[in-house]
Amino acid sequence: MGKKKRSTSKKKKTSTKKEEEEIKLEEIDKSKVSLKDAETLQAEMNLGMIGHVDHGKTTLTEALSGVWTDKYSEEIERGISIKLGYADAIIAKCKECPEPDCYWTKQMIKEEYQKDKRKKVKYDKCPTCGGDIEFLRKIAFVDAPGHEILMATMLSGASLMDGACLLVAADEKVPQPQTKEHLAALEIMGIEDIVIVQNKIDAREKEEVVENYKQIKEFIKGSTVKDAPIIPISAAFKVNLHELLMYIEKNIPTPERDLEKEDCRFYVARSFDVNKPGTEIDDLQGGVIGGTLSGGILRVGDEIEIKPGIRVDNKYIELNSTIQSISVGSKLVEAAGPG
């Protein structure tokens, strides 16, 4: 996320060693990164949560990250996602437990410890066996709305995704309208790293869940994701999340990033006006834009060009500005890499 305002500052041509170390994730020895330290890292992969309305995308995002992404009053009132939601999750692995029980997120570790109020949360120790926990990677969830009229919002989010979880509810016939449309959107975008999540298995009897599974298999037959794993879960009751994480780790890799790329492109998914009504002109702050960087490095002080810009007399005029601040999640940083 970059914040810009009117400025005459010159473009910075160099960065400090600290900045370079901060963003070159591939040069970090992950075996030495604690889960606490991982909070300061930039997410290295964007994972889309897609599927029909009310199939559990936001609930699953919260179960894995601890963040409920529906934050706007209308979303809360209507009980559906309207805008793209974002949340980071730190994925870790116990060195002692067998698969799939060895896979955790930081949030899952916290909640498992909190089941016993006598225990103190230890992010470096497995809450099940006490074995050492190792950091695997930090990912960002892009929670896309599933309602028909919000398809344009979902498509803007798809441009940010490196992979996706396609959620299909076990208590409804397959496929639902947006299940088909969201899968078609992924195929058009060329996103092939997909895990299919059969959610709400708690809402039906075993025989009905098995029949629903067969419907999913029939639905994806002949598609680009015909061989994608189908993982049955209950996001609401947090059942089978370890299994899901294992398949995410094995089927959705972190894409290769080019930090040296000169054509530095930032795809904008959302924007904010942080100015309060009645703010004097001299006190106006620039807009805030959120999205993902495809390659290269952005630094505070860099000059940027926003396209297509603003429309004047049926023509678009590009906007030029300077980056005043950069935040990754809630952390202010001096520079950011792809992701």
Question: Residue spans of the language-model regions?
Answer:
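Residue-level signature of catalytic and energy-coupling elements of molecular machines
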Residues: 54, 60, 79, 143, ...
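P-loop NTPase switch module centered on the Walker A-proximal segment
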Residues: 16-152, 161
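Short, ordered loop/turn segments at secondary-structure junctions
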Residues: 52-53, 65, 147, 169-173, ...
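Conserved Switch II/interswitch segment of TRAFAC-class P-loop GTPases
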Residues: 136-140, 144-150, 159-181, 187-210
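Signal for well-folded cores of large energy- and translation-related assemblies
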Residues: 65, 69, 73, 77, ...
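Helix-rich terminal scaffold detector
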Residues: 3-6, 13, 17-66, 137-141, ...
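Conserved catalytic-core segments of large NTP-driven translation/proteostasis enzymes
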Residues: 28-30, 39, 218-339
